[in-house]
Amino acid sequence: MEQAPPDPERQLQPAPLEPLGSPDAGLGAAVGKEAEGAGEESSGVDTMTHNNFWLKKIEISVSEAEKRTGRNAMNMQETYTAYLIETRSVEHTDGQSVLTDSLWRRYSEFELLRSYLLVYYPHIVVPPLPEKRAEFVWHKLSADNMDPDFVERRRIGLENFLLRIASHPILCRDKIFYLFLTQEGNWKETVNETGFQLKADSRLKALNATFRVKNPDKRFTDLKHYSDELQSVISHLLRVRARVADRLYGVYKVHGNYGRVFSEWSAIEKEMGDGLQSAGHHMDVYASSIDDILEDEEHYADQLKEYLFYAEALRAVCRKHELMQYDLEMAAQDLASKKQQCEELVTGTVRTFSLKGMTTKLFGQETPEQREARIKVLEEQINEGEQQLKSKNLEGREFVKNAWADIERFKEQKNRDLKEALISYAVMQISMCKKGIQVWTNAKECFSKM
């Protein structure tokens, strides 16, 4: 009974890990084992189509978006967008893939799926959904969530969300995810029957744990700072890109004025008419090309936005760890308090001021039978508290191991995806500049022939 309670911070750390960003053989092996569970041909962290057996067996696509009108829970008419999810077998028949399932889902159902995954897989960096309303838009881009271009970009984002889940070695095996792809009727009821809402941590409790935890894990504190920095950098990049798009759009459209001037000028010139007409045509082509260019840019902006929203998924893992750490510290504190009470009853000495000590002085000592009964109750509570503390320690260790394995997987994915997106964006900018040079070269030749 006199044994000091174990240090919850030491118990919550199963083994020393490398700093953020450093490779760790043990964690890599853990990721590999999880991947092996998803399929014999699974190969750990790789591209989406090589992560597990799911995407080797079926193709998942959100192939169509449709505007619909219906009644909501308040029996009020509303307009919404439904998305057609198709799954096809990769095993071809007569040279064509076989359509296995096809159903329509609303955006709110995608949100329900993600909320469920967040509760049941708190140690996993759950893929984010695309934005519900347009953010970081430049002035010519519509912010209306029913705009066809925005709906199309969101359709692509929702397809990417499903592919992210299907490529994850753990999430891909979830039954609710499988039913999301195959069961159109009563799917919401099936999700609600899991009782995931009751298991969700309250925001107030999470906020309380954030400020009251005494021994936070430095790795998760660093991870939280990393997610804040990631969000800040990508937000700044997207804001700058929106301002540049505004300016670039204006520069290109000015060339449309040049084209109109040259065309009108050619009508009053006899010798220079053909050259001016050709130069005006080149200016018009250049001015109209900006629409396709900025449409392509939105594709790369959406890739950046995905990782902007991933930052919140990282913070969700950190919040869960803080909650578990706080619960562990409270359990250790409660156990230490009970041990002290038991020791005071056995020895008859009171170390600190207590209400019980005051009542003893006022109303006299307890009888030996009463004291023995209290000691017995406290000993039972201490045994129960030790078991509870041990259970929380094991749960915490398992959470840290699994969470860190998935964080390392996410960071490799992030580095690969952002590198590819930024390189492709740079190549697109180079191509755009080359086309601009070519237009002015052609215009120069037209002028030189006058």
Swiss-Prot record:
The modification Phosphoserine is found at S22. GO terms for cellular component: cytoplasm; cytoplasmic dynein complex; early endosome; early endosome membrane; membrane; plasma membrane; presynaptic endosome; protein-containing complex. Disulfide bonds: none annotated. Residues 61-187 form the PX domain. Gene3D superfamilies: Arfaptin homology (AH) domain/BAR domain, Phox-like domain. Its main location: membrane. One of its GO terms (biological process) is protein transport. The modification N-acetylmethionine is found at M1. A 1,2-diacyl-sn-glycero-3-phospho-(1D-myo-inositol-3-phosphate) binds at R106, S108, K132, R154. The keyword Repressor does not apply. SUPFAM superfamilies: PX domain. Residues 1-46 are annotated as: Disordered. Keywords: Acetylation, Endosome, Lipid-binding, Membrane, Phosphoprotein, Protein transport, Transport. Belongs to the sorting nexin family. The PX domain binds phosphatidylinositol 3-phosphate which is necessary for peripheral membrane localization. Involved in the regulation of endocytosis and in several stages of intracellular trafficking. Plays a role in recycling endocytosed transferrin receptor and prevent its degradation. Involved in autophagosome assembly by regulating trafficking and recycling of phospholipid scramblase ATG9A. Heterodimer; heterodimerizes with SNX7 or SNX30. Interacts with WWC1/KIBRA. Identified in a complex with WWC1/KIBRA and dynein components DYNLL1 and DYNC1I2. Interacts with BIN1. This is Sorting nexin-4. It comes from Homo sapiens.
